[in-house]
Amino acid sequence: MIFEQLKLNIDVKDSAFNELYPNHIKELAYRHWTPIVVARMAAEYLAEEPNSKVLDIGAGAGKFCLVGAASTKGMFFGVEQRASLTKISKKIADRHKITNVEFIHSNINEISFSDYDAFYFFNSFYENIDTSCLIDDTVLPDRDLYYDYSEYVKGQLDITPVGTRLATYWSKWDEIPSSFDLTGTACNGLLNFWKKIS
């Protein structure tokens, strides 16, 4: 029902969407999972052509990818280092027959950005700095990882083709190379739209 509503561009409340998740994942939604209104705006910007391959950098419980796949004709890929979250995301996609989404259990530094057309980033590495609301205890926070992962993403984005699109939410912009230009903002400046210009 939720995904049919998203396909028909009917508003869906985050609280209703989050009911798809187990309780311990649902409790993290406010802090860690992209709100539907943000996911829809970002997905529409990123999936500018049918079958555009959009990578969610640090997909968490897969909410951005699931909403984007239901709302656009893009192909969404979510990379996540926690196997448990990847499993939950895949289960929801399978149960609701969402075929234009794929979840990858991997670390971001094992992913080549050249396989994708556009990118979404919701401050995935920040839990290595702010430990006040950890997702779980399977990944130990490490301040150096924040900088290492940000540098990796920056380097990968810098070698993408001119015209590549990027959307960031709650980002400190540490991962944005100077070759990208800010083309728009929404949500009081928290959601930013970028395009590679050089």
Residues of each region from the PLM?
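Conserved SAM-binding strand-loop segment of SAM-dependent methyltransferases
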Residues: 98-106
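Conserved SAM-binding motif I beta-strand of class I
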Residues: 75-80
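Conserved SAM-binding loop
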Residues: 89
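Conserved SAM-binding loop of SAM-dependent methyltransferases across substrates and taxa
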Residues: 63-73
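Conserved class I S-adenosyl-L-methionine
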Residues: 51-60
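Short conserved loop adjoining the S-adenosyl-L-methionine
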Residues: 110-114
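C-terminal substrate-binding/active-site "lid" region of AdoMet-derived donor-dependent transferases
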Residues: 128-198
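S-adenosyl-L-methionine
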Residues: 1-49
